[in-house]
C-alpha cells in the first residue's frame, strides 16, 4: 500500500467519478439496455464513514443511472452530479457551495473527461488502471484498480490524517 504525498489534514472534501473509479470499467447491460454496475463494499464503508465524520463527498459522473443515485444517496452522499457533460462546472459548483479552496479537495478520476477537474483540484488521484493521460496528471495513483478499492484507499488515508479512521464511533 502506498501513501499519498500531500498534507491530507488539509483535505475537507473528496469528489469521485463513478465508472472506472467506484465501479469497474466493465459495465454489463441489462436486457432492457440499462447499464448495470458493480460497486466495492469497502469503498462504500469508507465513503459513508467520511460523510458521518463531516467530510464533504461528491459524485460527479457522466452517467444517469438511477441505481447509482440510489446507492450513493444511501451512503449519505448529498452532492450527486449525474449526467455531468462538463465535469469542471459541477466541480466548481461543489467547491463554491461549501466555500472550499481547490487545495482542500481530492478528486479521483480515471479517464479523459476527468482531466480538467484533476488539473484544478488540489489533490488529483486515480486508480491503478486509469488511462495514461490521467496518470500523467495525478499526484497519487492508487494501488487498486477502479471498482476494486481505490476509493477506500484514498478515503482511509484522509480519515487517518484527520485522526478519524479507527475512532471509537467508527464502529456504529
Segments (PLM) and residue ranges:
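Mg2+-dependent phosphoryl-transfer enzymes with acidic/Ser/Thr/Gly-rich catalytic loops
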Residues: 33-40, 74-75, 79-81, 88-172
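Conserved functional loop/turn residues at catalytic and ligand-binding sites
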Residues: 15, 54, 63, 76, ...
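Substrate-recognition element of Asp-dependent hydrolases with the DxDx(T/V) motif
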Residues: 47-71, 81-82, 118
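Non-catalytic pre-domain segments flanking phosphatase-related domains
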Residues: 1-18, 164-172
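Short coil/turn segments at beta-strand junctions that form active-site/ligand-binding loops
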Residues: 10-12, 55, 103-104
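Asp-based phosphoryl-transfer active-site loop
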Residues: 9-26, 118, 151
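A positional/architectural concept
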Residues: 22-53, 62
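Short secondary-structure boundary segments
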Residues: 18, 62-63, 84, 128-131
Amino acid at each position: 500500500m502506498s501513501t499519498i504525498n500531500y498534507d491530507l489534514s488539509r483535505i475537507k472534501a473528496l469528489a469521485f467519478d463513478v465508472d472506472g473509479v467506484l465501479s469497474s470499467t466493465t459495465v454489463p447491460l441489462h436486457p432492457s439496455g440499462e447499464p448495470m454496475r458493480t460497486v466495492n463494499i469497502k469503498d462504500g464503508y469508507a465513503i459513508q464513514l467520511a460523510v458521518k465524520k463531516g467530510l464533504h463527498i461528491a459524485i460527479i459522473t457522466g452517467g444517469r443511472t438511477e441505481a447509482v443515485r440510489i446507492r450513493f444517496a444511501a451512503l449519505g452522499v448529498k452532492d450527486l452530479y449525474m449526467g455531468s457533460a462538463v465535469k469542471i462546472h459541477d466541480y466548481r459548483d461543489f467547491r463554491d457551495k461549501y466555500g472550499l479552496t481547490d487545495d482542500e479537495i481530492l478528486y479521483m478520476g480515471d479517464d479523459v473527461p476527468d482531466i480538467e477537474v484533476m488539473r484544478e483540484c488540489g489533490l488529483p488521484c486515480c486508480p491503478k488502471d486509469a488511462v495514461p493521460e490521467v496518470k500523467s496528471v495525478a499526484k497519487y495513483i492508487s494501488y487498486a484498480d477502479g471498482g476494486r478499492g481505490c476509493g477506500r484507499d484514498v478515503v482511509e488515508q484522509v480519515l487517518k490524517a484527520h485522526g478519524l479512521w479507527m475512532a471509537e464511533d467508527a464502529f456504529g
